[in-house]
Amino acid sequence: MQKIIKLKDLKIGNDLPFTLIAGPCQIEGLDHALFMAEELVKLTTRLNIPFIYKSSFDKANRTSVNGARGLGIDKGLEVLAEVKRAFNCPIVTDVHSENQCAEVAKIVDMLQIPAFLCRQTDLLQAAAATGKIVNVKKGQFLAPWDMKNVHKKLESFGAKDILLTERGTCFGYNNLVSDMRGLAIMAELNTPVIFDATHSVQQPGGLGGSTGGERKYVELLAKAAVAVGVAGLYMEVHQDPDNAPSDGPCMIRLDNLERVLTKLKKYDEITKEK
């Protein structure tokens, strides 16, 4: 029987209706965060889709030194706390160093380990020590079966609730490919698996000083993942992605999200019907 993780009133499991993890790539300010959260909460409530709000206080791995990194941990956590207070929705954000974990855990419901840092033992240990759910993104450089070692590290440090997220694999230069077998392989670890549909269309460093992407393939890959069967979908969303400070080429447009989610929910129901 597949493991089910409980978060507030949500249940996250590979055999359950998918949970949506969504929000803008980085926190741009309080007003923008509240606007995005309100729109996403209203939409997912209307469609009866379990929802977790995601946004980053620091984009620490930008391609260029000139790339916008975000509000930073202090102001960023203040914004996330306001979102949580206003809408009572679960929150996830990423951590980049061990000394951030305890502070971030005071505000959020789930800690996320970035793909580039997924093998950093000290970071995994610090995240596990918070007692929060830990979502680890599979490194673009790792095979899906290698995530068993990451999973074992977290378990050895006492983590009880672990999510693994597929976000594409390096395929030559400036390109990623999604191997849908990886979703099933990681699920064999008896842990909920998430598919990151927006970062999977990234073209890392593809614009020279920033990351490119192929937004037009987000829906296609999300359909494929839902057809395989996943516990959740991860989508970064923006009302004006072409003018977003980071990952604009990958993010799905807010005004297109309802149409996409409506389709995905139908696919999900077919995949998981008894």
Swiss-Prot record:
UniProt pathway annotation: Carbohydrate biosynthesis; 3-deoxy-D-manno-octulosonate biosynthesis; 3-deoxy-D-manno-octulosonate from D-ribulose 5-phosphate: step 2/3; Bacterial outer membrane biogenesis; lipopolysaccharide biosynthesis
Keywords, in A-Z order: Cytoplasm, Lipopolysaccharide biosynthesis, Transferase
Highest taxon listed in the record's lineage: Bacteria
A single cellular component GO annotation: cytoplasm
InterPro entries: Aldolase_TIM, DAHP1/KDSA, KDO8P_synthase
Family: Belongs to the KdsA family.
HAMAP family: KDO8P_synth
This protein's name: 2-dehydro-3-deoxyphosphooctonate aldolase
Originating organism: Rickettsia bellii (strain OSU 85-389)
Gene (name only): kdsA
